UniProtKB/Swiss-Prot annotation:
UniProt keyword terms in alphabetical order: Ribonucleoprotein, Ribosomal protein, RNA-binding, rRNA-binding
An example Gene Ontology biological process: translation
Molecular-function GO terms, alphabetical: rRNA binding; structural constituent of ribosome
InterPro entries: Ribosomal_uS8 (IPR000630), Ribosomal_uS8_CS (IPR047863), Ribosomal_uS8_sf (IPR035987)
Entry protein name: Small ribosomal subunit protein uS8
Alphabetized Gene3D superfamilies for the sequence: 3.30.1370.30, 3.30.1490.10
A Pfam family per the record: Ribosomal_S8
Family the UniProt entry places it in: Belongs to the universal ribosomal protein uS8 family.
Gene of this entry: rpsH
Species the sequence originates in: Oleidesulfovibrio alaskensis (strain ATCC BAA-1058 / DSM 17464 / G20)
Task of the protein: One of the primary rRNA binding proteins, it binds directly to 16S rRNA central domain where it helps coordinate assembly of the platform of the 30S subunit.
Signal peptide, first to last residue: none
Length: 126
């Protein structure tokens, strides 16, 4: 049993990128589906496929190097981090994204800011 499934997903993506794998499989959940959709929308992964009990994420590379250079879990199971709409951080001076769990669903930081909603700061990706 995993205590932090989102951290597990981020770690699997990080490890697969370091090993230059084409794709990685993570256990399926609605939260992970939403995270994968945001990663695809923002151009950090090529695509993702839903299987019966897993999500297969196709990783993206540019000139042989991973598009994702860093992943960081912010809100953890032992220490939750909540931010208001005005306190949503800019990641790497605007070169990265932060992902929040809000009352409007899982959103990328700029979308949450434009909708004027805050929430739990899940992770940063750059």
């Amino acid at each position: 049993m995993l205590t932090d499934p989102i951290a597990d997903m981020l770690t699997r993506i990080r490890n697969a990128h370091l090993a230059l794998h084409k794709e990685v499989s993570v256990p399926r959940s609605k939260m992970k589906e939403a995270l994968a959709a945001i990663l695809k929308e923002e151009g950090y992964i090529t695509d993702f496929k839903m299987e019966e009990s897993s999500i297969v994420i196709e990783l993206k590379y540019f000139k042989g190097k991973p598009v994702i250079s860093g992943l960081k879990r912010i809100s953890k199971s032992g220490r939750r981090v909540y931010v208001g709409s005005t306190d949503i951080p800019r990641v790497q001076n605007g070169l990265g994204i932060c992902i929040l769990s809000t009352s409007s669903g899982v959103l990328e930081g700029t979308n949450a800011r434009s909708k004027n909603v805050g929430g739990e700061l899940l992770c940063e990706i750059w």
